[in-house]
Amino acid sequence: MVASLCACGASNDAADNAAQTEETTDAASDEATDAATDAATDEATDETADAADKAGVMPAIAKEDIKVGVIHIGDPATGSGYSYAHDQGIVGMQQTLGLSDDQIVRKLNVDDGDTTAIENAMLECVEEGCNIIFATSWGYMDTCEQLAAEYPDVIFSHATGYKSNGTNFNNYFGRIYQARYLAGIAAGMKTTTNKLGYVSAMGQENSECTGGINAFAMGAYSVNPDCEVYVKVTNSWYDPEGETQAAQALIDAGCDVIAQHCDTPNPQLAAEQAGVFGVGYNSDMSKDAPKAAITSVMWDWSAYYTQAVESVINGTWDGSNYFGGMSDGLVNIAPLADFAAEGTQEAIDEATAKIESGDWDVFDGVIETNDGSTVGTEGEHMADADITGNMNWYFKNVVVK
């Protein structure tokens, strides 16, 4: 009986052990399965996130199907100014990407102070099937913002502004101040009166214009601490007659080099007619005033337009803003004229190397202003937000007329 009881007890123990072993094995198996599932899920999630990063925020559009709109404040055919430079960028993009002429829609002479005209031009682009619309003037900004909300499948890319929505509405501009600094060197070395003139579309309330004036003045000061920059403001982005009048007033005041931040080559034409010199803007204005233009501050807008349209084609458009510089090929100066002062090229080459190294930029460190105060911090770069939106001061050698 005892033996039977013992045998029975041994059998129960074995069964219990077997059951425990099975539970342990099942638990281990379940845990391993869960871990493998979690790992696979994490990997899939990472791959999905990577794919989303690469995909951008708008769907890809086949190259043969894409249509590009561009809104100009002027007519590119009428001169070498702002609209001409932007349109040359569109042409460069078209050639690089192999788009046909009927894939480009242009709207010309759209007054950036006429909201009805602006909206009509953009809506025409939408109705003609444009997938991305480049709005090239400051005053187009609010209409871009409005229509981007109404047409979420169309990209509105606005030049020179500050608004965006991170998806189908961005802004683009560049570090044109870098090229203006180099042009200032050329002007500062050429002047004999130590009076440089500067025709500006807008005044101290506009950081884009103020930054250009300051950079030009700082470049001139770096090679000629005795020179001053006299500024005449037209209060218009496009005013051919006003630009001529402003240039003439500066010449009458004794300025012997006329720089500009305005849309037409008229200041250079006025300089040539008066027998003085100049620095053009937007494109190489030596073709307009070959006896006056020492150099020109130039844009190569194709650097941005090609990148932007290509990103729409391959589906990587991410809605980010763009602020390119010399290292991106967006801004530079035209080749120096034969009558530039001796040593100018060497001085410009030295400054160019500093800028392109990335170790130094125009608005670094502490800067003295023309009201006796200072801006900036020793050993630090000025923030892009301050360059593009908070530059309401003038460098110490600037005189506003």
Q: Where are the language model's segments positioned?
A:
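Sec-dependent N-terminal signal peptides of Gram-positive bacterial secreted proteins and lipoproteins
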Residues: M1-S11
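A residue-level marker of the well-folded mature domains of exported/periplasmic proteins
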Residues: C8, A15-K401
